[in-house]
Amino acid sequence: MEPSGGGLGPGRGTRDKKKGRSPDELPATGGDGGKHKKFLERFTSMRIKKEKEKPNSAHRNSSASYGDDPTAQSLQDISDEQVLVLFEQMLVDMNLNEEKQQPLREKDIVIKREMVSQYLHTSKAGMNQKESSRSAMMYIQELRSGLRDMHLLSCLESLRVSLNNNPVSWVQTFGAEGLASLLDILKRLHDEKEETSGNYDSRNQHEIIRCLKAFMNNKFGIKTMLETEEGILLLVRAMDPAVPNMMIDAAKLLSALCILPQPEDMNERVLEAMTERAEMDEVERFQPLLDGLKSGTSIALKVGCLQLINALITPAEELDFRVHIRSELMRLGLHQVLQELREIENEDMKVQLCVFDEQGDEDFFDLKGRLDDIRMEMDDFGEVFQIILNTVKDSKAEPHFLSILQHLLLVRNDYEARPQYYKLIEECVSQIVLHKNGTDPDFKCRHLQIDIERLVDQMIDKTKVEKSEAKATELEKKLDSELTARHELQVEMKKMENDFEQKLQDLQGEKDALDSEKQQITAQKQDLEAEVSKLTGEVAKLSKELEDAKNEMASLSAVVVAPSVSSSAAVPPAPPLPGDSGTVIPPPPPPPPLPGGVVPPSPPLPPGTCIPPPPPLPGGACIPPPPQLPGSAAIPPPPPLPGVASIPPPPPLPGATAIPPPPPLPGATAIPPPPPLPGGTGIPPPPPPLPGSVGVPPPPPLPGGPGLPPPPPPFPGAPGIPPPPPGMGVPPPPPFGFGVPAAPVLPFGLTPKKVYKPEVQLRRPNWSKFVAEDLSQDCFWTKVKEDRFENNELFAKLTLAFSAQTKTSKAKKDQEGGEEKKSVQKKKVKELKVLDSKTAQNLSIFLGSFRMPYQEIKNVILEVNEAVLTESMIQNLIKQMPEPEQLKMLSELKEEYDDLAESEQFGVVMGTVPRLRPRLNAILFKLQFSEQVENIKPEIVSVTAACEELRKSENFSSLLELTLLVGNYMNAGSRNAGAFGFNISFLCKLRDTKSADQKMTLLHFLAELCENDHPEVLKFPDELAHVEKASRVSAENLQKSLDQMKKQIADVERDVQNFPAATDEKDKFVEKMTSFVKDAQEQYNKLRMMHSNMETLYKELGDYFVFDPKKLSVEEFFMDLHNFRNMFLQAVKENQKRRETEEKMRRAKLAKEKAEKERLEKQQKREQLIDMNAEGDETGVMDSLLEALQSGAAFRRKRGPRQVNRKAGCAVTSLLASELTKDDAMAPGPVKVPKKSEGVPTILEEAKELVGRAS
């Protein structure tokens, strides 16, 4: 024990230095100064000698002894400045922090005098106790003296009390030297415990831990402890579940160290110590914690272990680090232990469990956020695969990764099922990797709980959606069909309306004509009536005159009766009187013809008049037939009916009376008929036969044309037409190629090469041969004589070695020798007589693909059997069919059918089909007609619908108006200002006008304008549904297709009309093609009308939007609209993406600011617990840390997303850093970026670095 005055110098000097005063400045020792000195000595001795009890314990008795203390009276005599000095020394000795000292300093000077007086009285009472505490150096000496067992335990208990009760200055005196002694003893006890375990060893270890706790209950002690090399490791080694109380204290101390604000990463130092201890003991580093959490241990130990786990995980800033630690604990069995801990009813346990769960959930959401960042930054398949491959390469995970890929190859290659497989696999992988509570799954457990019910429900819903989409597609097709039918009906209705209007016009014209004729007839009638009246008057006058003449004649006749009788024969007869039956009155002029060419009946003739019949034609009773055209088939005139010598006159018209011939004039005789010709029978002989009649043999048919049809049978009773006499017919030309031309003379004395005919076809060398014209007189090939090497054995070897057939030839058997071999019948290679080898080969290949008898192929063509005939079959048949001349030549070889090659046999059979090639072309057109209609009709409907949609779309019109408004505003003051409209093609050029910052175009501006102010305009792409289809329609090709269809229909119709009469009952060509032509013509007329309507609408659209339809084709116009439609939709998406990016940048900036603010708050909260950098020696630090750990205040903080991170472990940091960099570049003013956020690598850089490390 030191004397009371011995510590004046050091203690006083220390405090004087802290307050900026030297010892010389203190009052002198004489007079009152002696009393003052005694007071200061008491303060100093108090710091050296302390009782074992706490200073506060003496405060209870201070009031009772205060009046008896002579020091109080002496304290009243010193100045206020000296009181303040003593007061500051008292505050320092009381181990109060600055926050608690400030209210005391604000007290009045009187209160401060009382406080100092009470404190001095308390210190005096402690000094008067019989037992005074030992000094720090004495403890150090005792610890170094090698105490063991009970003596060591007693010393450690006394040391613990001293460390708890003495001020910080005492702890500082104990300092690093005393701490080293404690750690040496603790290490020795740990090492000895592994060999032998004494009764006091565990108690001594626990007591040392308690001493360390007391030593670290201030900043000096914590700093000193952290400066040691093995201090944390020894605390970790003290976590022994066999000594629960010691493990509890050790775990609490380690937990407090983990949450210290300075130095950083204290949790990592504790983890390193735990790892080193695990390597020493050859166990898992978290195994002691798991052992302490298991059942059978105390609740306090479980709380302490879980508290240390939270302290290890929570301070870490890196997401990967937290997930890694948590997953390692789960793999050791923490998952099962947690279920037991949740059943414990303890408040401290609930606090720690709550902290663990909250931190795990937050990490889970952070991990999901990292997945979003990966999706944004790493979207290249090859790059992602390469990174994963380099990650697992040459590791234990490599075969498992390969197995995963191999299993993926087994996914069923089904269009519908494959996406469902991958969705299920993705969900499983997501739940495995992004496991709840931010941990890895329990790999020891065979049963892994994966929630796929929700995914299956989604798949079921997706299947329903897909079915609905399929149904919608089907309905869309039906809608297109209905639209097509509607357009067809519209065209038909328009045609009917036009026809009706035309008929109305025709009827109105006829009515007008009839009215005009009626008026003319009425006028004529009036004229005739007037004329009749006039003539009646004249007749009456003439009748009167006649009567007068008769009377006069009668009177004269009475006078000259005799002379009149004698000369009556010479007097000419009087002219017939009016009204006599023999009077012939010329008929009135015929009336004008009625509309339609109908001649109205003439007015009736007066009674007794007659019209003589027209004279017969000269020569004749019969009209000779017209002469036959040259080259046409001779068709004899029909024979006369039996018993009829001449053509009878036509019968009278119905209702008409026969007009008798006029009677002969009085006194005239009938005109006799003309006498017959000499030797005639009264009927003129028929004219001589014209050229081409029966007697002259017909000319041979044209090449490729059909033969002459047989003559019709004779009428009954008429003689048959004799066949042409022999020799009168024109012989057919000789077959092609059968002429034997003279052999050309070869140059240089060359002779024609011998033509070989091997028994079987050999493999042919593919050389480039020289002909005689390629050679020169001095070249090698003009002198060769290869014939000298010719022999049968050589040819047999060639046949054996290079035969194109696979079967063993007879030549091989002949070569092997053997006189008793049997002759093998070989199929002769039939020579081609008409066709060339290439044509015959192609035809044989074609016929081999059908495997049908030739006659059946012929019958199918004759019957036009569409069930067998296909488009490709007819096309190949037309392509491979021999020419008509060749078919004609083959038809003449019918007698040699069996000796012909197969291809020529087919030609013989097909040559009997009349007009084969036109027939095949017509059949091909019939098979293709429906496809042509289905190709043309949708194109017409698309253009028609697109024209109608453009005219009816109000939203598109609004967009054009907005564009016109914006354009006129932007062109203000230029030559383009004040426009009334613009060309539609300008819409595609909107994106060429860019903004001042080059970040958007005029098109983007219009799209954003529509989004914000006119959202209904955004619907115009849906209203122009047929513009895309119309953009693929070429009006020129459409017109050509219609013209081609019209021409083909006309050709087929002409072929049907000119087709000869069928000679085979199976020939249904004319019958089927006639009905087809009729239907095809109707379909064509409908298409033509639809096309005409389309052109009309497009022309009207040109007038509507002011463009020339002749210069701007349908395809170009709708292609511009289609491109603009796509560009507008793309601009809308880009605007949305740009807004999302700006929003992300804004949120990222806010998140960064918030995270930085929370980091500072966290730092402040930690510093509130303990400020390691502040001046002064604050006590009770460890108690505050342990209290914060126990209540959860050290963990609970408002923590935003961990995207803002100083480390590179969090993927989102890269996105925020890049976005903030862009945002800062765009900001008008400078923005200070914290240095901690600089240099943060992006996730792509991390991946590339990982690839580099792996490779």
From Swiss-Prot:
Location of the FH1 domain: 586-747
Biased composition (Pro residues): 585-736
UniProt tissue specificity: Widely expressed. In the organ of Corti, it is expressed at the outer and inner hair cell layers. Expression at the inner hair cell layer is restricted to inner pillar cells. Detected in cochlear spiral ganglion neurons.
Extent of Gly residues compositional bias: 1-12
Matching SUPFAM superfamilies: ARM repeat, Formin homology 2 domain (FH2 domain)
Domain (DAD): residue spans on this chain: 1177-1205
Phenotype when the gene is knocked out: Knockout mice show normal organization of the cerebral cortex with no significant differences in cortical white matter or callosal thickness. Histological analysis of coronal brain sections at early and postnatal stages shows unilateral ventricular enlargement.
Pfam families: Drf_DAD (PF06345), Drf_FH1 (PF06346), Drf_FH3 (PF06367), Drf_GBD (PF06371), FH2 (PF02181)
Residue positions where Phosphotyrosine is found in the record: Y1104
UniProt subcellular location: Cell membrane; Cell projection, Ruffle membrane; Cytoplasm, Cytoskeleton; Cytoplasm, Cytoskeleton, Microtubule organizing center, Centrosome
Ranges where the FH2 domain occurs: 752-1154
Gene Ontology cellular component terms for the protein in this record: brush border; centrosome; cytoplasm; neuron projection; nucleus; presynapse; ruffle membrane; spindle
GO terms, biological process: actin cytoskeleton organization; actin filament polymerization; actin nucleation; axon midline choice point recognition; brain development; cytoskeleton organization; ephrin receptor signaling pathway; gene expression
Function, as annotated: Actin nucleation and elongation factor required for the assembly of F-actin structures, such as actin cables and stress fibers. Binds to the barbed end of the actin filament and slows down actin polymerization and depolymerization. Required for cytokinesis, and transcriptional activation of the serum response factor. DFR proteins couple Rho and Src tyrosine kinase during signaling and the regulation of actin dynamics. Functions as a scaffold protein for MAPRE1 and APC to stabilize microtubules and promote cell migration. Has neurite outgrowth promoting activity.
Protein name as it appears in the record: Protein diaphanous homolog 1
Gene: Diaph1
